[in-house]
Amino acid sequence: ETMFVFIPLAHRLGLYGIKSEMEDIWLRYKEPEAFHEITAKINRNVIDKDKEINDFIAPIDKALVDAGFRFEIKKRVKTPYSIWKKMNTKRIDFDQIYDLYAVRIIFEPDENTKETERDQCYHIFSIITGMYRYKSDRVRDWVNYPKNNGYEALHCTLMSKTGIWIEVQIRSRRM
């Protein structure tokens, strides 16, 4: 009932935090071993990587300020349910999940420039890929080709200076 009624309802209403929480609760009760194993791996990784992620973000923050962008940067760790679903759907191991950590760059479009909102996404992409190596097969362009649900963003996966893959999602506040 939760999986087929309440989770889709929360998603449709835009209650993404509640949706994620219900998915994790569902996983904890339906697949307790998988839930505990994934949660333990997340906890080990997050404690070790939090400083590295902040160190990854700092130069991006500075470069975007220097380029004149108005923005905020948020970070997130993928939820246990999302990890479990990806592992099962793609038949991959935990270590093959490249978007365990994600950084969202949400910018305010500059109306005083000739660059369109889309161009500004690519400008940010150009700045950050000039700083970090990116995984070319992990670039997702949902700015030029929005998802069926209307989602727009530019995703790429970058290698930090310490060797961890971090997904970066670039979008305007409107997107």
Identify the role of each PLM range.
Residues 1-175:
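Nucleic-acid processing machinery
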